[in-house]
């Protein structure tokens, strides 16, 4: 398997278009992660079925979040995407998140060319309010059976805040 951090750039952040590699399909309870050391996907653990991912979950290549992993992405699509699929995506916001005391932000995006929705999603405000609630509930509670209170969505940010999070993550990658 090719190393996504070698073959893909983060994308055109200023234009709000990023490259995304999908790790976990929407609806999956398998915690699949990109293992940078071996350049392959790895099953980290199986979550309880009630904590299946509410969206596709992936990362932006050549970025590092404050937790030391590639910057996470919540990718909104009508149907689940397979592990290993990569695409250009449009940034629509950021979910500011703390996991076990570490910043672990999630960039929220949609496919850059989404003819199904007519490219209707340009900001978090364009998403169904109930989807935002479901995502927030998931991330506030998905570790509750093992470590109650260890995760917290602190707030939702707009496209510009998301771009700044991405820029900082690119800087961390380049300085590693």
Swiss-Prot record:
One of its GO terms (biological process) is phosphate-containing compound metabolic process. It is an enzyme of class 3 (hydrolase). GO terms for molecular function: inorganic diphosphate phosphatase activity; magnesium ion binding. GO terms for cellular component: cytosol. Keywords: Cytoplasm, Hydrolase, Magnesium, Metal-binding. It comes from the Bacteria. SUPFAM superfamilies: Inorganic pyrophosphatase. Mg(2+) 2 binds at residue 72. Mg(2+) 1 binds at residues 67, 72, 104. Pfam families: Pyrophosphatase. Its EC number is 3.6.1.1. It is found in: Cytoplasm. Its cofactor is Mg(2+). It catalyses: diphosphate + H2O = 2 phosphate + H(+). Substrate binds at residues 31, 45, 57, 142. Its main location: cytoplasm. InterPro entries: Pyrophosphatase (IPR008162), Pyrophosphatase_sf (IPR036649). Homohexamer. Catalyzes the hydrolysis of inorganic pyrophosphate (PPi) forming two phosphate ions. Belongs to the PPase family. This is Inorganic pyrophosphatase. The lineage of its organism: Bacteria, Pseudomonadati, Pseudomonadota, Gammaproteobacteria, Pasteurellales.
